[in-house]
Amino acid sequence: MRKQRFNPYLPSWEYIPDAEPYVFNGRVYIYGSHDRFNGHAFCLNDYVCWSAPVDDLSEWRYEGVIYRKTDDPLNPDGRMCLYAPDVTLGPDGRYYLYYVLDKVPVVSVAVCDTPAGKYEFYGYVRYADGTRLGEREGDWPQFDPAVLTEGERTYLYTGFCPKGDKSRKGAMATVLGPDMLTVVEEPVIIVPSEPYSRGSGFEGHEFFEAPSIRKKGDTYYFIYSSVVMHELCYATSKHPTKGFKYGGVIVSNCDLHIDSYKPAEKPMYYGGNNHGSIVEINGEWYIFYHRHTNGTSFSRQGCMEKIKILEDGSIPQVEMTSCGSADEPLPGRGEYPAYIACNLFCGEESVYTDLTGAWMNNQFPKITQDGKDGDEEPGYIANMKDSATAGFKYFDCKGIKSVKIKVRGYCRGVFEVKTSWNGEVLGKIPVEFSNIWTEFSASIPIPDGIHALYFTYRGSGSASLKSFTLCTD
């Protein structure tokens, strides 16, 4: 029997944001940066890889460390972090890993004979005279490399353009030769930054960071994070280095713009920067993105949703869900971990994870874990104060008669159970102080049908929620 698919799609103790998904030899491989649980900055860990068979996206396999930050000659002491990478299959049949260290403006390249083996440093992207791209006078710093190889040419997309920064004009496309390093066509701007977007069609969704590139048929899809950070947008063109037109938002990691179950501009999760891409797996298309956990921007986790590319090439925005890649709603019975919440909010509304700039902010409810980074401890929701709500989507409910929850913390109150974020309270589960995980339950019939489930804490103190169980007897 296959395992159930959830979001996040990897174990709850793994933190891989900025995912670039690829299918090689019947498996889906995930290349991303690697955050640290309780980390104080982005991308503190070495690159690791996970993969799954294309016909079973519940069976993710840890491939191990594929590249260490100290493998780059510019970083022998490891003081610089490995930022978001990308991988492409070169014309020689080898796999090339492109990345940027966090304190230099150049693109590094590593190579491997297999998708998830030990990559070895290969060189730096450079002009024909040997000058490294990003270091020539007039160059903009390179950031977040994305790559696509067609024949003997590799298209490299880079850029970082904070809102209001007139020194950066937009996302860049550079063409490399068959050695995978040498520039054969110099950088050109393909999507504008905010100061240069007037009349472009990108207004309000200008390029910020996180470029990614895919091709479907004869159409190039440029995926990127806009200046509002939480959304992954796309632009399309029939040419890899020009003519890109704004397409829309594919996903927001706070579910902004979605109006199918709430007001369009109401945030339903604590968002932040976003980075990911699209991929076709067994004839279906998916968007990979990341969410923020632990009350910080430095412990991000990968999520995925199924998308549709319509006949005209457009991609409608999708909701964040708990189902992830699952083809059907989750079964409306049994125990589910709280860390699969796709909605998390409280009475104090916020688009972003942390408005204070604090490390591991406790202003809002948050998904976290016990232990230290690398400990295989299951995630849970902490800091659920009065009005804190966790939402889970979607369940195929049939004959549910009661609901159990596992809670701990200095709390006294009730958890309200609903099938919509602002809907009728179907029942209440009383909870009280416990310093260990304790199960509480109540008779709460849930109507048959496909529903979301929302748990809202009402009371004093602060509760942590580990799981809930849907009971049919």
From Swiss-Prot:
PANTHER family on file: ENDO-1,4-BETA-XYLANASE, PUTATIVE (AFU_ORTHOLOGUE AFUA_2G04480)-RELATED
Protein name: Xylosidase/arabinosidase
Quaternary assembly: Homotetramer.
Organism taxonomic ancestry: Bacteria, Bacillati, Bacillota, Clostridia, Eubacteriales
Keywords from the UniProt entry: Carbohydrate metabolism, Glycosidase, Hydrolase, Multifunctional enzyme, Polysaccharide degradation, Xylan degradation
Molecular function terms from GO: alpha-L-arabinofuranosidase activity; xylan 1,4-beta-xylosidase activity
EC annotation from Swiss-Prot or TrEMBL: 3.2.1.37, 3.2.1.55
Enzyme active site: 18 (proton acceptor), 209 (proton donor)
CDD domains: CBM6_xylanase-like, GH43_XylA-like
Site (Important for catalytic activity, responsible for pKa modulation of the active site Glu and correct orientation of both the proton donor and substrate): 144
Reactions that this protein is recorded to catalyse: Hydrolysis of (1->4)-beta-D-xylans, to remove successive D-xylose residues from the non-reducing termini; Hydrolysis of terminal non-reducing alpha-L-arabinofuranoside residues in alpha-L-arabinosides
Class of the enzyme per the UniProt entry, highest EC level: hydrolase
One annotated GO biological process: xylan catabolic process
Disulfide linkage: none
Organism: Thermoclostridium stercorarium
Family as reported in the entry's similarity comment: Belongs to the glycosyl hydrolase 43 family.
SUPFAM superfamilies: Arabinanase/levansucrase/invertase
